A protein has these predicted regions:
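Iron-sulfur cluster-binding electron-transfer modules in prokaryotic oxidoreductases
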Residues: 1-183
Length: 183
């Protein structure tokens, strides 16, 4: 493969490929080397847009938009150390108001199989996350992991809330559509 980067919209996959494949292939030198070559090129979408594409300030500013809050997916925050990139993308590149959420990097309750294996615990965790989202007053939650999106959307729907939950890529898409078709 000749690509410089392998961009993923799932930060959990980036963490797995970039950090855990060494353990999986430790007994097989050929596959270990292959996994390391891939691991060096895999990057999450938010980091790619921030560090590689280097989108200039305001290039996705399509005018007024609802304030947003950001849920830091556990592995994005703790393993990949993605902290400031989403904030810059939202505030500087898109020109949006970011309302910081209490416990933004605390698990939403999805946690891989936690929501399946321990549903009552997952429900308690997501209720706390939803309360923190409510406290921001933002009608839109952005995150970078499909598992969190699935769990948060389901919990928002079940609770009757009207908050929208979007992946970073979905937000970028909305802003691009607003720029190309402002009507």
């Amino acid at each position: 493969m000749d690509a410089d980067y392998i961009v993923s919209g799932a930060a959990s996959c980036v963490a797995m490929i970039g950090h855990d494949y060494d353990h999986l292939f430790a007994e097989d030198p050929e596959w270990l080397e292959r996994s390391r070559r891939v691991g060096k090129r895999v990057i999450d979408l938010t980091t790619f847009l921030d560090r590689v594409a280097r989108l200039p300030a305001g290039c996705l500013d399509a005018g007024p938009f609802h304030p947003v809050t950001y849920h830091h997916f556990c592995q994005s925050h703790n393993v990949l150390k993605i902290r400031e990139e989403p904030k810059r993308l939202i505030t500087e590149v898109m020109g949006m108001e970011l309302r910081e959420m209490n416990e933004a990097s605390t698990c939403c309750g999805f946690g891989g199989s936690v929501s399946i294996d321990h549903p009552s615990m997952a429900k308690h965790i997501v209720e706390r996350k939803l309360a923190n989202i409510d406290d921001t007053g933002a009608p839109l939650v952005i995150t970078d992991n499909p598992g969190c999106i699935l769990h948060l959307r389901g919990s928002v729907d079940a609770s009757g809330r009207t908050v929208r939950v979007l992946h970073v890529a979905e937000l970028v898409d909305e802003r691009l559509r607003q720029l190309t078709d402002p009507a």
